[in-house]
Amino acid sequence: MFLIVVPLFLVILVGYCYGRTKPDSGNADKLINDYVLYIALPALLFIAVARADTSDLKQWGFMLSTLIGIAVSYMLAALLAKRVGIGLPHSSLLSMGASYGTTGYMGVPILISVYGEQAALPAAIATILHNIPAIMAVIVSWDVFSTRAIGANTRLIHSVGRSALTTVKNPLTIAVLAGLAFVLLDIQVPVVIESFARFLGNAAGPTALFALGLGLARLKVKEHLNVTVSKIVLPIVVLKLVIQPAVTFAIAVYVFGMDGYQGVWLATAVVMAAQPIGAGVYVFAKKYHYQPDVIALSIIISLLLALVTIPAVLSLFPPS
């Protein structure tokens, strides 16, 4: 398992080294990230879902264990934030950090590299499940608790609608929904479109990991490291890398009875839950001007620790 995973992390290392040696390559970084987010990954997720059978989508244990794992980490982070005097809406960002991972950029390519094409569909579904709840919770929290407009109910409805629109407009969400439409309407994907999507999707894995390395090279640990920040960061990282996958595994196996015959689905649920903190949390921290240093440090530490924790998690689910 270690030998399977090493090349994946070497691609991240190559991206990191390139980013460090080319500090002025900001436009190139953006183009690579845009290619991954708007073209390669959506193509991969679309074809994975579009070629599925409706029976493949009825993985209720997989979906519920994933969502419960997210919810538990989110709520524990909220309790931690409250304990140190951080309330809503600010605590929603810390909760997002404890439950939102790099499922697209890192989780998808790792799963497909280790388990093959059979992991593409569960990885696509998991990506959406991990994106929607945390993003919506942050947007709603900041809209409702940080404004003083008249009419709380109207404000809440507007906020929920806006957050739903934001998540639906995500290219990865659009790709999965488009693929789902083909399945539900029983439409055969034309050969040309399938070949085109596969050709683009084949580049998603290495390009996404390279882009992840580039992003890591742009984050500066020393600027964010201090004792106060570390007291918040470390529990968040533990929640993300340890508690969330542990809860997901426990619910999947002991509540929903997922076992060997659902091996890839079980592995996907746990591996996706074990992903390091996603860069999207930093985007929201910058947007709302709340402790981007805490989030940046959390992302860096979780990524570094993931070099050890993800291979450990994968070793529990060896490919058949």
Task: Show where each model-derived region lies.
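Alpha-helical transmembrane segments of multi-pass small-molecule/ion transporters
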Residues: 1-320
